[in-house]
């Protein structure tokens, strides 16, 4: 299973967006999934920002800091915003949900790590 599938499965199993992504990349961080979930940023922290967005930034800051700016660019190209509430509303109108965002974010991170 790839990072996108793992992150989506984590989310379907009840993890929040941020923890889902951190757990998916735990091995790459050199820690257990439980340890990774504990250091994941809180959802809607930092002024209501999306947990997936915050997790993506933080994961890349730890694994490939020079890719953070490109991550932000790609995230905004896909989503147009990084605020949790507006992303939820926008995605509902598109027939998508947070699980889709988690998967897309994992895919962006994975592509930037290659």
Where are these regions (language model features)?
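Alpha-helical support elements that line or immediately flank enzyme active sites
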Residues: 23-25, 59-63
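Active-site-proximal helix-loop elements at catalytic-domain edges
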Residues: 1-26
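Glycine/serine-rich anion-binding loops at beta->alpha junctions
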Residues: 42-58
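Glycine/charged-rich beta-loop-alpha catalytic/anionic-binding loops adjacent to active sites
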Residues: 1-6, 32-42, 86-90
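Domain-length accessory/inserted modules outside core catalytic folds
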Residues: 31, 45-47, 60, 79
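Generic structural signal for well-ordered, non-membrane alpha-helical segments
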Residues: 14-18, 36, 46-49, 64-68, ...
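Acidic-glycine-rich active-site phosphate/pyrophosphate-binding loop
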Residues: 21-39, 76-84
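C-terminal binding/interaction regions
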Residues: 67-114
